[in-house]
């Protein structure tokens, strides 16, 4: 079966999911991102790699970190950046998604960065754009968030060196999390020997065992001797029905406190894709501790998105 993210030469042309993404492509992105990370105290480099290309940010769902870091990344690559105001666009007047894309393509769009509430929307767009136009998935429904997973992989590699002896615990609302799915695919592709998914039974999707992960409903069991702890927020906006008694009850059993973090390895790092809800999935004392690398994720996200845009466009320094 053909991989819609690659051309016939095996080169990246769209970034839609970490599922099925070859290890060599993931490592290419991480290695290229490393060349973009500025030295401490310096700014991100300004490079002409996307000079003359137009990058359209199409965010049909709200975003702060992802949209902003994509915009910064594109500008650092000298692209012309267009942020479409979805609420004021023709899509709010009934225009179809593909008609919107066709009209923007006629404006010489070179790259679409798409966040959409419908799983599969970026795939649909990628199937209908011209060969010289590229698509990056910035999050689609519950399905995938590949650049978040890639920046997570970069952060882990930066702090831990390699992946082949790590235990990684992903904790929280896995049922509704596109980040969890994308992280799992990336971690297993990169050879992490033990990936644990930790959540109450009501927030665990079916089929996790087939993804090669260990499922834990007990927080202490899931955290024990972990090298990396990735916390996920409760996605109340996607929940249907009473999946949890209360946020207070959730924190009581699944919130990451200093006492629970002590079950992990002493040098364990704590990550979070944001937005972070203190006192719900993570205690402030942990979020503000030296083990938390959450702001590193944001910084590295710019470099990783620079690398992703460069590779799909077929350019590099």
From Swiss-Prot:
Enzyme superclass (EC): transferase
MF-aspect GO terms: amino acid binding; aspartate carbamoyltransferase activity
Which reaction is recorded as catalysed by this protein? carbamoyl phosphate + L-aspartate = N-carbamoyl-L-aspartate + phosphate + H(+)
Q: Name one GO cellular component term.
A: cytosol
Pfam annotation, one family: OTCace_N
Q: Could you say which residues bind L-aspartate here? A: 93, 178, 233
Q: Which PANTHER family match?
A: ASPARTATE CARBAMOYLTRANSFERASE, ORNITHINE CARBAMOYLTRANSFERASE, MITOCHONDRIAL
The free-text function statement in the UniProt record for this protein reads: Catalyzes the condensation of carbamoyl phosphate and aspartate to form carbamoyl aspartate and inorganic phosphate, the committed step in the de novo pyrimidine nucleotide biosynthesis pathway.
Put simply, this protein is called Aspartate carbamoyltransferase catalytic subunit
Recorded source organism is: Bordetella parapertussis (strain 12822 / ATCC BAA-587 / NCTC 13253)
């Amino acid at each position: 079966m053909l991989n819609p993210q690659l051309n016939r030469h095996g080169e990246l042309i769209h970034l839609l999911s970490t599922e099925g993404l070859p290890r060599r492509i993931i490592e290419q992105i991480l290695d290229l991102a490393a060349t973009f990370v500025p030295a401490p105290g310096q700014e991100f480099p300004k490079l002409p790699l996307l000079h003359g290309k137009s990058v359209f940010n199409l965010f049909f769902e709200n975003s702060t970190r992802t949209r902003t870091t994509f915009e910064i990344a594109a500008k650092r690559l000298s692209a012309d950046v267009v942020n479409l105001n979805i609420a004021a666009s023709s899509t709010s007047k009934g225009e179809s998604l593909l008609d919107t894309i066709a009209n923007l393509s006629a404006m010489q769009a070179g790259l679409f960065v798409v966040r959409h509430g419908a799983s599969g929307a970026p795939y649909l767009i990628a199937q209908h754009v011209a060969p010289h136009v590229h698509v990056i998935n910035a999050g689609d429904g519950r399905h995938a968030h590949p650049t978040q997973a890639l920046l997570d992989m970069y952060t882990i590699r930066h702090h831990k060196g390699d992946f082949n002896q790590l235990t990684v615990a992903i904790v929280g609302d896995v049922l509704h999390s596109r980040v969890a799915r994308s992280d799992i695919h990336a971690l297993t592709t990169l050879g992490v020997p033990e990936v644990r998914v930790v959540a109450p039974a009501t927030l665990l999707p079916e089929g996790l065992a087939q993804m090669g992960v260990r499922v834990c409903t007990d927080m202490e069991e899931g955290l024990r001797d972990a090298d990396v702890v990735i916390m996920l927020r409760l996605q109340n906006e996607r929940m249907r029905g009473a999946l949890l008694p209360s946020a207070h009850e959730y924190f009581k059993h699944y919130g990451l406190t200093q006492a629970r973090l002590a079950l992990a390895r002493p040098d364990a790092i704590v990550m979070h894709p944001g937005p972070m809800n203190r006192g719900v999935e993570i205690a402030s004392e942990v979020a503000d501790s030296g083990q938390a690398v959450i702001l590193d994720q944001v910084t590295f996200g710019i470099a990783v998105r620079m690398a992703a845009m460069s590779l799909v466009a077929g350019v590099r320094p």
